[in-house]
């Protein structure tokens, strides 16, 4: 079955989903409890739950995970969300199939501007749909110690009616620079005659940004991949 999915990343000036100016101040939201805060030499981060998402930050679907952080460029919040399987009336449907979307949105807490947005989706799928972030894969780091945070999100996408790997992706942003790692989940497909399990998938490729970026980025990405590539 052919897998159909698309990926959009929108810069902060492109407000397809945020056409109306928000009156609420994102910075007025409740600050996470101090026990949740992690500090390094260049970064202060705190995982947030759905109740701590600023009221001015509107997201589609169900809250999955979130972080608030401060680096040398300012203070920010990121939220990941999933729609689950549904029908998006804005999509073209030729097969009377279903849709599913995942979102990651980063906002500045200083001026309420959207810094970047990731929207990946499956559309018009007649079989099983998988569009979900990997649990606890959202993270905020400063691996190159330059004072600018790296934001990591990992998710899988599939439209399939058989036992086969799903598409797997890691999207990372440092400021407005996007890095992408793409491949497949690793699944067990059977057993050899002497009892050894047989696996399929698990491979990946780095985009140009990752290849040209610091080795620390690739090392972290590979560890994240190895930890979460199973279905």
For each of these PLM feature ranges, what is it?
Residues 1-5, 19-20:
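Positively charged n-region of N-terminal signal peptides that target proteins for export
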Residues 15-17:
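C-terminal motif of bacterial Sec signal peptides marking the signal peptidase cleavage site
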Residues 57-64, 125-138:
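Repeat-based blade/solenoid architectures
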Residues 75-80, 145-155:
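Acidic/hydrophobic-patterned starts of short beta strands in beta-sheet-rich repeat architectures
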Residues 87-98, 127-130, 158-164:
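Short consensus segments that form the blades of beta-propeller domains
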Residues 100-108, 167-175:
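Beta-propeller blade signature
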């Amino acid at each position: 079955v052919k897998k159909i999915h698309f990926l959009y990343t929108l810069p902060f000036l492109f407000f397809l989903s945020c056409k109306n100016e928000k009156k609420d101040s994102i910075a007025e939201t409740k600050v996470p409890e101090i026990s949740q805060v992690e500090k390094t030499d260049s970064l202060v981060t705190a995982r947030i739950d759905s109740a701590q998402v600023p009221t001015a930050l509107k997201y589609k679907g169900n809250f999955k995970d979130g972080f608030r952080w401060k680096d040398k460029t300012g203070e920010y919040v990121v939220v990941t969300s999933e729609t689950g399987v549904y029908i998006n009336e804005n999509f073209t449907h030729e097969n009377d199939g279903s849709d599913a979307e995942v979102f990651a949105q980063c906002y500045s807490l200083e001026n309420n501007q959207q810094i970047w947005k990731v929207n990946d989706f499956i559309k018009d799928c007649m079989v099983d749909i998988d569009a979900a972030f990997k649990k606890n894969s959202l993270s905020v780091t400063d691996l190159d110690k330059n004072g600018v945070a790296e934001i990591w999100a990992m998710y899988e996408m599939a439209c399939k009616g058989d036992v086969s790997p799903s598409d797997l992706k890691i999207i990372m942003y440092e400021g407005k620079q996007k890095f992408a790692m793409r491949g497949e989940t690793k699944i067990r497909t059977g057993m050899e005659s002497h009892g050894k399990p047989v696996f399929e998938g698990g491979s990946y490729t780095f985009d140009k940004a990752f290849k040209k970026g610091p080795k620390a980025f690739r090392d972290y990405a590979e560890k994240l991949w190895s930890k979460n590539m199973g279905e």
